[in-house]
Amino acid sequence: MSGRRVLALYAALLFGFAGVLCRLFYLASRTDYAARAAAQSTVTLELPARRGGFYDCMGLPLTGLEKRWLALCFPGQENYTRLYACTDTAGQELLYRSRSRAAPFLVEVDRDMTALGIPCYGASRRYAAAPLCPQLLGYLDGEGHGAAGLEKALDALLTGSGARDTLLCPVTAQGTLRTGEQVQHLQADSGAVGVRLTLSRSVQRAAEAVAAQTMTTGCILVLDVRTAALRACVSVPGFDPADPAASLEAPDSPFLNRALQAYAVGSVFKPVLAAAALEAGLAPEYDCNGAVVVDGQIFRCAGGVPHGEVDLSAALAKSCNGYFIRLGQQLGAQALLQQAQALGFGRSIGLAEGLIAQSGALPGAEELAQSGQLANFSFGQGSLLATPLQVAAMMNTIANGGVYRAPCLLDCALDETSGEELSAFARPQAERVLTEQTAAALHTMLEQTVVEGTAQDASGLPGGAAGKTAMLFGVPAS
C-alpha cells in the first residue's frame, strides 16, 4: 500500500474517532438525555391506595386492626430467608417466584424490618381474622372499591381521589439498588377520610360472642336508649369479608343482614296493643280459658293452657292470646294501626345509602275489617311483618319514656391523622308517641314479664331487665 493511501486511511480513522467523541460529549452534556437514562434505570412501585377506615363511637378502629408492613426486596439480597419466616403462604410463594427476578418488588410481612436493613412501609389488613359486623361494613371488590354494605355506601368518602404513594428505586441492570443512592418515597394525598360509627367495639364483640355460643341463625341488636344509636348489630351466620367468594355457596345466607329483614312478628307485638289500651284509658280484666272463638275460628293460647283471671299486666307477662284478641276488638283496627305506625311499624329505616331496614308490612283497614284478621293482628300474626330493628326501636321507645327515634348508625367523617371531626351525619328527629305515664306503665309490665312471666330466662341480670318473648312457627324469639 502506498504512503498516500495509508495516510488517507489514518485520516479517515481519526475523523471517525473524533466524530464518536463529539457525539459522546454531546450526549453527556444534554441533561434531558441524562434524565431519560436515569429514568430507564429507575423502577417505580406503587403502594396500595390508602382507604379511610371505620371507627367506633370512642374512636377505636373497626377495620385495619391487624398491622402489616410491605417490605421492599431487591434481587440478590441475602435476607430472603428472614423475609420467608415473616410472611404468609402467598408471600412465601412470591419470594420463591422472584428469586431470579431482575427488579425490586414488595412483599407483605408481619413486622417492621427496617432496622434490619430491609425498607418497610406501613400497611394493614382491612379485615381481621375475626371480622366485626361484616354484613354492616360490607366488603371490597377486586379493585379495592366498596361492593356491599357501608363500604359501598360510603365508597367515595373512603376512597377520595384514589391517589397512591409511589417508591422510586434507582437500580442497576441486575435490578439491585445503585450504590450510594436511596429509595424515594413520594407521598400522595388522596383526600380519603375515615368514618366514625355509633357502634361500640366492645359491645359488638360481646354480642358476637353471645351469638356464637347461642344461635346458628339470628341477630342481636343493642341500642342506646337516649339516642337510639346502634351500639351493636350482629347477624349470624357471618362470612369473611376478606374472602367473600368462599361463602357464595354457604348455607343459611351469610351475606343477609337478618336485623334488616322483615319477618313474622308474633307476641313481641303485644306491647303495641298494651300501649294503645293505656293511651285510651283501657285496662280490662279477662277470664282466659285457654282459647277464644272468633267467627267460628278458634285461637288458642300457647299449649291451650288457661291463664284464668288476668288484667293487662298479667296478660302481657303470660302472653295471653285470648286477652289481646278481646282487647283488639275493643280498641278497633284504626286505633291499632295508628299506634303501630307511631311506634315505627310499616316504615323503613335508612342507616346509609343502600343500607335500609325493610318497611315490613302492616295489614290495611279493609283487611282488618274481617274479624278473624283483626284477631290475628292483635297478637302479632296474620300478614304483619317487621324487622328486628323495628321491634328494637319500639322497645327503645318504651325505655326512652315514650319518645321514638329511628335507629342510626353514622356519626361523622373524621381526619384519621388528627382525629378531628370533619362533618357530622344527620340524625333522625325525636318524636313523642306515648305519654310518659304510658311508657312508665309499660316498662313496669315488661319488667314483670321477666320476673314472673314468659321472659324469666332474662331474670337475675345485673341492673335488671324488661322484655317480651314470642313464638314464631314453633321457634322462640325475644
Feature names for model-found ranges:
Residues M1-A245, L337-A342:
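Periplasmic/cell-envelope proteins involved in peptidoglycan metabolism and beta-lactam response
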Residues P61-T63, D224-S267, A275-S478:
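Beta-lactam-recognizing serine transpeptidase/beta-lactamase-like catalytic domain environment
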